[in-house]
Amino acid sequence: MMMETRDPAIKLFGMKIPFPSVFESAVTVEDDEEDDWSGGDDKSPEKVTPELSDKNNNNCNDNSFNNSKPETLDKEEATSTDQIESSDTPEDNQQTTPDGKTLKKPTKILPCPRCKSMETKFCYYNNYNINQPRHFCKACQRYWTAGGTMRNVPVGAGRRKNKSSSSHYRHITISEALEAARLDPGLQANTRVLSFGLEAQQQHVAAPMTPVMKLQEDQKVSNGARNRFHGLADQRLVARVENGDDCSSGSSVTTSNNHSVDESRAQSGSVVEAQMNNNNNNNMNGYACIPGVPWPYTWNPAMPPPGFYPPPGYPMPFYPYWTIPMLPPHQSSSPISQKCSNTNSPTLGKHPRDEGSSKKDNETERKQKAGCVLVPKTLRIDDPNEAAKSSIWTTLGIKNEAMCKAGGMFKGFDHKTKMYNNDKAENSPVLSANPAALSRSHNFHEQI
């Protein structure tokens, strides 16, 4: 009776936990049912039915708990995702200040004040100030702040010092007129003109000379100036015609090697001949004809001498030759040029007042024309008497008579050699016994 009244299970959080005694009693009841089934007792089914009902209730409670658990988990996940989304959205478009104020990201795209490009982006607020938004231009790689000045240095310029020199020539572009008559099909607008290395040499060697001549004849820039290299077959020689009436104005006479040389000689006389010889010898200040697209800038006559340039194939930055003074061209000793050197001539500049200074200038010009270079003479001191009689002392301003009266400039050297010979004569039998000591003595005396 006590087993029937006592609760066979404990309810905890909606679940029933059965005791082990209940399982044992259930096993004994099943054994009794098998034994008494043939006898037809009705009591055994009555005992079994409440236990089976308890088991069914336990299974139902377990299923209900499992069904309610995923619902609660789904609700928790939904709330957590909502919180994450709400926390992420203000961080993307807003910026918090130390005071707690939120600064919204501007959506309007501002053009670059330097290159007027619309490829810009907002970076951040400078010092968390809404009046100083900092932007970045992708085209010219520069930052600028509203209300401030723009950075003139491109981003990362300090790290590009060790790169090749060809990267500095990006500002040299090809004009539209040169683009229409280009030789190399690979060149386009806003591309590099200079190229270095073996590829550039192969291209220059393989390029024919006939299209270069066509370019020189046909090509002109819109403003009327010729921006090109002078070819070998069409060298333009500029001659200054100096007359007594108008010395300041010079006429540029364009002459070719084949046709108009005689005409220019007839017009300008000996001045043109002298300058033609100088120009032919110099070969356009050391520049040879470069087959390819002509240079898009005007010719600069103030260029360094030919020895200044490296051999082809080696990259070298190109800088104008502005600061180094150039030697003036050789003036011909003609009566026309002598008239221009008068004090009454209309040419600007200083004019010599004394005849002595003009004579000195003429002497220096003659020396330069003759190519005389002072080379110091070598003086051998094998014989001091002959060295004292040499002509080098007269060039230095030293009189030979005083040296001879005083006994010669190299008297000390002569005395030392005599002493050295006497010592060697006296010590020779002693030193001959020890060859090592003899060689050391020779080296010592030679060092002295």
UniProtKB/Swiss-Prot annotation:
Subcellular localization is given as: Nucleus
Q: What are the start and end residues of every segment in region (Disordered)?
A: 26-108, 243-269, 332-370
Top-level taxonomic group: Eukaryota
Asked whether the keyword ATP-binding is assigned, the reply is no
Q: What induces it?
A: Circadian-regulation. Highly expressed at the beginning of the light period, then decreases, reaching a minimum between 16 and 29 hours after dawn before rising again at the end of the day.
Q: Which sequence ranges does the entry mark as zinc finger (Dof-type)?
A: 110-164
InterPro entries per the record? Dof, Znf_Dof
Phenotypic effect of disruption: No alteration in flowering time, probably due to the redundancy with CDF1, CDF2 and CDF5.
Residues given in the record as Zn(2+) binding sites = 112, 115, 137, 140
Task: Give the keywords, sorted.
Answer: DNA-binding, Flowering, Metal-binding, Nucleus, Transcription, Transcription regulation, Zinc, Zinc-finger
Question: Compositional bias of type Low complexity: which residue ranges?
Answer: 55-69
Q: Which Pfam families match?
A: Zn_ribbon_Dof
Ranges annotated as biased composition (Acidic residues): 29-39
Instruction: Report the GO molecular function annotations.
Output: DNA binding; DNA-binding transcription factor activity; zinc ion binding
A single GO cellular-component term from the record reads: nucleus
GO BP = flower development; regulation of DNA-templated transcription
Q: How does it assemble?
A: Interacts with ADO2 (via kelch repeats) and ADO3 (via kelch repeats).
This chain belongs to the protein called: Cyclic dof factor 3
Origin species, per record, is Arabidopsis thaliana
